[in-house]
Amino acid sequence: EVQFDCDWTRTTRNSYFKLCRIARDSLHKKGIELSSTIRLHQLRDDCPPVDRGVLMLYNTGALKSINTKNSILDYLDISPYLKNVSYRMHLDFAYPTFSWGVWFRDNKFKAISRTTDFLDTNYYQQLTDGTYKVLKDHYLESHELLQDDIIRLESPRYDEVLKVKQLAERTLRNN
């Protein structure tokens, strides 16, 4: 199987669908199937010409907003997309199995960090559950963090993943 991952929109749809048709026809001659990732906002549009879709049930929130609690997975972000929806293609579901730190300076998004050691109390102070303040200037992943920068640790909670899974399966089970 070959899988295409494209955040296509209504303006790029025709070009992407043409690519999918050409690739699918070529792959089928070799006995290979083509799948495509499907983002939540794409559920309201036509299905791409592929053998199956994989619905991405992650990266649902506003990553760059300081006010977001968890941009990786939030049931409240997903549920509006799955109300009264049907999709004319079989969908598998992809759930998040990763975490990251979202770094802010002066309430403005700077970068994503994947290797922050929040247990090092010389450099980080926990402010709230999942939010840390930088205590000393230092480098992390080639980025210079400054005192008072904020890092929001995001990780999907198991109970939240299960809740989203139940909603997706209940809503889209016949696909």
Residue ranges of model-derived segments:
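Substrate-binding surface in catalytic domains of secreted glycosidases
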Residues: K18-F118
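Acidic side chains
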Residues: D5-D7, D51, D148
